[in-house]
Regions:
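Short, surface-exposed patches at the edges or C-terminal ends of soluble domains, predominantly
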Residues: 1-286
């Protein structure tokens, strides 16, 4: 076999590998690299926002909102300092958190907000699923403008601050998981979204809003409008990508994720196609 044949097929194999990297992913919940139903790939592809991995990049920001999806709560003192300065500069933080991992951070920031992990259920639900509950705006705020109802999947309870969104009266904390409101489980409205008194920190006790299955279904209540409001809280949307579950990609998945950037794929394709063309023309002339 001639040398140009070897080079040609070698580049062809490389092109296939690049395509495989681009379309591969993982199955980690909320991961940006998870293209399955429980990933957040669709939201991140559409958001097109600046990714924050180094908290020093928060300094000097104006009129910006930092979005944190399921943060792990393992913040360093320098990161907390950066967040405090970020808020002092008049910016906003939106946190979606079901298990309550952000409670320590919320306390340090002095927000008075927290998440109480709970099996919040309701007969006012979508698809006759008591865990797929419908929630309603409770007080006026820009984040709920044009929103009449939102469907959330297995939310917890948001506490403190000003309640902005609640479940209906036909809701209860299903402590025993039997899907029924027992005598020891009183009915009542529960908050699923709150904000601090300063109007700078928002807390949503559910992150399913951003997963592919729900985000991709544009006709699900007013979920799409709600997400657009979140993204439009400020002129600039920044997406936290150091502690958020969206960044979950260990080992090879993390490497593949880094290679999946649009610029890398475009440059790789251009180079490979150019070389393949040159080799093909060179081989034809021989």
């Amino acid at each position: 076999m001639r040398s140009w044949h070897i080079a040609f097929f070698g580049l062809l194999i490389l092109a296939l590998l690049v395509a495989d990297v681009h379309f591969s992913g993982n199955d980690t919940e909320f991961s940006r690299y998870n293209y399955n139903w429980n990933g957040t790939s669709q939201f991140y592809d559409d958001a097109g926002s600046e990714i924050i991995t180094d908290y020093s990049n928060l300094y000097g920001r104006k009129n910006s909102t930092l979005l944190m999806i399921e943060p792990d709560g393992k913040f360093t003192s320098s990161e907390i300092t950066a967040l405090m300065r970020f808020l002092r500069d008049g910016n906003k933080i939106f946190i979606s958190d079901e298990p309550g991992n952000s409670n320590t951070l919320l306390g340090i920031l002095g927000t008075g907000l927290s998440v109480t992990p709970a099996n919040l259920s309701s007969t006012d639900s979508e698809y006759n699923n008591k865990r797929f509950i419908i929630c309603y705006p409770y007080k006026e705020d820009g984040i709920t403008a044009g929103v009449e109802s939102v469907a959330l999947n297995s939310p917890s309870v948001a506490e403190g601050g000003i309640s902005l969104m609640r479940s209906s009266f036909l809701s209860w904390i299903d402590t025993n998981g039997n899907g029924k409101a027992d005598a020891t489980e009183p009915l009542g409205k529960r908050s699923v979204m709150v904000r601090d008194e300063a109007g700078q920190v928002y807390l949503l006790s559910d992150s399913s809003l951003f997963i592919n299955r729900m985000y991709g279904y544009k006709r699900l209540r007013d979920n799409d409008r709600f997400i657009q409001n979140i993204m439009g809280l400020s002129d600039n949307l920044l997406v936290e990508y150091r502690h958020s579950a969206a960044a979950s990609a260990d080992g090879l998945s993390g490497i593949l994720g880094a290679l999946k950037s649009t610029d890398f794929i475009k440059i790789s394709v251009i180079i490979i196609v150019t070389l393949l063309t040159i080799l093909a023309l060179a081989g034809r002339d021989k």
